Amino acid sequence: MAKTVSWHIINAKILDVFNLTFETSELWIDHDKIVYRGRRSDLQAQHTFDAQGQYIVPGLIDAHMHIESSLLAPSEFSKLVVPHGITRVIADPHEIASVAGVSGIQYMLEEARQSQLHIHYMLPSSVPATPFEHAGATLHADALKPFYSVPEVNGLAEVMDFPAVFNEDEDMHQKISDSQAAGKHVDGHASGLSREQLAIYRKYGIDTDHESENAQQARDRLNAGFSVFVREGTVERDESAILPAISVANQAHFSFATDDKTANDIQHEGAIDFNVKLAIQSGMSPAMAFTIASYNAATAHRLDNVGALTDGYVADLVIIDSLDDFNIKKVMISGQWYVEPETTVLPLANQSLNFTLTVDDLKLPINDKKPAHVIEIMPHHITTTHLVEDVPSQEGLFVADKTYTKIVVAERYHNLGHGVGIIKGFQMTDGAIASTIAHDSHNIIIAGTNDEDMLLAANKLREIGGGEVVVNNGQITTLPLAIGGLMSEQSYTTVIQENNTLQAAFSKISHLNFDPFLTLSFMALPVIPSLKITDQGLFDFNTFSFINIQD
């Protein structure tokens, strides 16, 4: 008597990730697992799906990302990405944890359970990221340890405090050992590290990295034994420069990641499906590109029976019409065809903004006989260039112009102070922008051409409880982010519309052709080269110390 299973998919060209080939075959699926790939006379199915010669690939996996960067709660994020073929993400809730601590992690876990998307979490390793900024929380090893028993938790997220690892900081090493003792693994964050420094990370079992910006850096990480996550996000556009490092011989050690990508960019160009398209357009075989986007990511994160279309694997799959400019026709997650669910975003107790700024606080004294240290934006990268240049001043104070913009970071949790600096590359002709998204501690960050609009923007953030603001001659445009000042309680369609309005308002005061808010958010991250600013002042990555505006 034939055994009955849930689904029989016929007439499909199915990706074999083990041989990097497509073969015409069939899939038998029972509940959430693939029972068999191929013909079987002893099986029958409750439902049959005729793929009509279309292609089937495993569900795409984002190997490293932050849901908060989409400005969406997890349940709304899933509604946006699943139609792009994404069936699984490995997320680091570092952003909300920096604001709300343990309760932030608990919120992300609970909110994600409304989603059909598989959301795995890596526990934030560095809250705060460094001692050079004030955060809303401090998470020691003992606070993280209970989470390792949660099924959705997959390990320790990007270890970004290299000095703590190198100097054998007790708490950092306890976090690493706790993850490994629980049978989990540890992600790296090796921005700016030399080959010798990479070896230190590997010594302690840190086994992945997503910070390569070019092929040589990717080869260095590969040679050191890392799994390399090839990043293509909103700001960090690294994939094209890394692709030359990938070959048939080494492809198994590469995966795709977005890291930080806005909802607008996901809607317009895609998520990991965009990584795949870039790879194919660059000459990579579709079979290899889809394997990197699925099975390799699952392997890097030690996800058993995930990422392949054969016996015993979870039935996560995507049906596409062609291999060149592929269009996604259907998505199956755990044996169920995806239909967008009706869900409501869960609230998070309000995180009030506690800061005080005056116009006098924003003034920046400058000696016009000396050059100043200036942060220069690198388009489509989160690294910056450290410049020393003459800057405009008047009556002993810095004055912004079309080249140089003032930047301020104000501590938002305990009103502990602020840092003021100069940034080049925002191309602002008027007004100001401000945000409660400032990696990784998410203090208030403001950039502007005049102190009055900058102060108005900051005060508007307090009024709306966090978010993003554009001010143009007193006219204010806002995108409220009620969840910790990082995520919206609204639907993904509403957030995309509000962000479009915000970007349109910014376009009236700047000629910048890339996302200003995501770019601005990384100007406060001191663990990324080269010159950044925190609530404590101007920070030089190369010396790992604070410096004055002028020597």
UniProtKB/Swiss-Prot annotation:
Its EC number is 3.5.4.2. One of its GO terms (biological process) is adenine catabolic process. InterPro entries: Adenine_deam, Adenine_deam_C, Amidohydro-rel, Metal-dep_hydrolase_composite, Metal_Hydrolase. SUPFAM superfamilies: Composite domain of metallo-dependent hydrolases, Metallo-dependent hydrolases. One of its GO terms (molecular function) is adenine deaminase activity. It comes from the Bacteria. CDD domains: AdeC. Pfam families: Adenine_deam_C (PF13382), Amidohydro_1 (PF01979). Its cofactor is Mn(2+). It catalyses: adenine + H2O + H(+) = hypoxanthine + NH4(+). Belongs to the metallo-dependent hydrolases superfamily. Adenine deaminase family. This is Adenine deaminase. It comes from Leuconostoc citreum (strain KM20).
